[in-house]
Regions:
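Long, charge-rich, low-complexity alpha-helical segments
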Residues: 278-292, 298-312, 316, 356-473
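A short SAM/SAH-binding and catalytic strip from SAM-dependent methyltransferases
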Residues: 131-145
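Conserved class I S-adenosyl-L-methionine
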Residues: 166-193, 209-215
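Glycine- and hydrophobic-rich flexible loops that cap the catalytic core of alpha/beta enzyme folds
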Residues: 199-227, 235
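C-terminal lobe and adjacent flexible extensions of AdoMet/dcAdoMet transferase-like proteins
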Residues: 231, 235-373
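N-terminal charged/capping segments associated with class I S-adenosyl-L-methionine
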Residues: 4-125, 172-179, 471-473
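A short acidic, Gly/Pro-enriched loop at the edge of an enzyme's catalytic core
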Residues: 124-132
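A short glycine-rich, Lys/Arg-flanked "PGG" loop and its adjoining helix->strand segment in the class I
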Residues: 148-160
Length: 473
């Protein structure tokens, strides 16, 4: 590849081909730049290993594709931290892809190719067979025809043994919020301005309706409680894209599995790691009741009804090979993990719908202490193997630690660009780690690192932690 990244090459036909998707999606405002750590190869590999399924072989290279890549933050960070991979990002909004190309060019990322196309046009491209195909959130924002074209892309371009990550708004967790979404979408149609302004106008009307005693709104968890909290941490563009998409529709797990079974895909597990362990999220009586349901898809549906699941991160495969319990154990012990926070801030407990899972013991503390000096393979930590596995999986489920790559790569240039693009008006809080992931940093911490501002006491341990992480251990 030449010194000029393929991410810079603009095809004038792309804008026209992408525009065919526009009426079925919010396109007048750009979505906020986001990083999805669940889409990392190491994270998806761990999900496969938990299910005793062989992850893709990556030693000699691999291919990864994101459908609905937005402004390319996830794709760029993954490409930069996995130089042996061939990365592709596809999004039907030309503005998103233009931003993604600028980010990749400025960061010097040469193994990322970006396409401003809808899924139907992308399916016809001459692309590699992908070991990983990821689609974060988009599956429940698009209509049935667009979901079909997404599946056609997967069917055509998934490599043998490849993994597919699809996350989506799920039922029945959204059931109480359906009237809220329907009403905000309907009210927004008569408002003026762009989608952000339309959502704001619709929300203002709904606040007056709620105050007057509109039961369908006041019984909505999103409207009654969550929306105000979300406004403090999410971009206004999020609300426009989340709630004003014409085809917005939360899906039952059985609907998604049935659609993907039509192209030969079967469920592997959940990228929400704790959801792979009934003992973490279900009470004993719930586990007993579910045990009576033999069909795995119906069992998962009943489980979602128990938990009122509202978001799923499902991993699928067509033909990934099963592995023995012995191989699974060995590969899990060989997995490299990284700490996601300073050691002093770690909480050795995880609240779940089934109660609080506690792992405040010597083995968990040993794992965290070892990882405080940088990423390590689990086998490098002293302790009984079975205890190490059990506690590492609890720590990973609580996102105290993450599965990462064992080989560190330089990320200074990428982080310098991310820092330059990070402004108060348009926050970009993510900073890459050399081990193949990125962390979202607190605003005050980013100001301290950039400008030397006083650091709040709650963040005192972070600069040293990040310095060690940046050094790759």
């Amino acid at each position: 590849m030449s010194s000029k990244s393929r991410s810079d090459i603009h095809n004038p036909l792309e804008d026209r081909r992408a525009s065919s998707f526009a009426p079925r999606y919010v396109t007048d405002v750009a979505y906020a730049p986001t990083f999805t750590h669940f889409a990392a190869p190491a994270w998806l590999d761990l999900t496969a290993l938990l299910a005793a399924v062989a992850p893709p072989a990556r030693r000699s290279g691999f291919a990864w594709c994101e459908l609905g890549c937005g402004r390319g933050v996830t794709a760029t960070i993954q490409a930069a931290t996995h130089p042996l991979g061939a990365f592709h990002g596809i999004d039907m909004m030309p503005g998103h892809i233009a931003d993604a190309r600028r980010l990749a060019e400025r960061a010097g990322v040469a193994n990322l190719t970006l396409h401003a196309l809808d899924f139907a046009a992308a399916a016809d491209l001459d692309l590699p067979r992908f070991d990983y195909i990821v689609a974060h959130g988009v599956y429940s924002w698009i209509d049935s025809q667009s979901r079909e074209t997404l599946r056609h892309f997967v069917d055509r371009h998934l490599a043998p043994g490849g993994l597919v990550y699809i996350s989506y708004n799920a039922m029945p967790g959204w059931a109480a919020d359906l009237p809220f979404q329907y009403l905000v979408h309907a009210l927004a149609q008569s408002a003026v301005g762009d989608s952000i302004a339309k959502f704001a106008a619709a929300e203002a009307t709904m606040r007056r309706l709620g105050a007057a005693g509109t039961r369908a709104l006041n019984n909505s968890p999103i409207f009654a409680r969550e929306l105000a909290k979300q406004r403090k941490r999410l971009s206004p563009a999020y609300f426009a894209h989340e709630y004003l998409a014409p085809a917005w529709q939360p899906l039952y797990v059985t609907e998604v599995r049935t659609e993907l079974a039509a192209i030969g895909l079967h469920a592997v597990g959940s990228a929400t790691l704790r959801d792979n362990f009934d003992s973490f999220v279900l009470r004993a009586a719930q586990r007993s009741a579910l045990h009576e349901i033999v069909d795995p898809d119906l069992r998962e549906l009943a489980r979602d009804c128990m938990l009122l699941t509202r978001f799923r991160r499902d991993v699928f495969s067509r033909d990934a090979a099963p592995i023995s319990a012995r191989e699974r154990r060995g590969r899990l012990l060989g997995q490299c993990f990284a700490l996601t926070q300073p050691e002093a801030l770690v909480k050795y407990a995880m609240p779940t719908p089934g109660g609080t899972v506690r792992f405040d013991n010597d083995v968990s503390h040993s794992i965290v202490t070892e990882l405080a000096d940088g990423p390590r393979r689990l086998v490098q930590v002293a302790g009984p193997a079975d205890d190490l596995l059990a506690n590492a999986l609890a720590l990973a489920s609580a996102e105290v630690i993450r599965p990462v790559e064992s080989d560190a790569v330089p990320v200074g240039a990428l982080n310098a660009v991310l820092d330059e693009l990070d402004t108060e008006a348009a926050p970009l809080p993510y900073r890459a780690l050399p081990c193949g992931t990125a962390l979202a940093l607190d605003t005050a911490l980013r100001r301290h690192l950039r400008e030397g501002r006083r650091l709040p006491p709650r963040l005192v341990g972070w600069p040293g932690f990040l310095a060690r992480a940046a050094a790759g251990g």
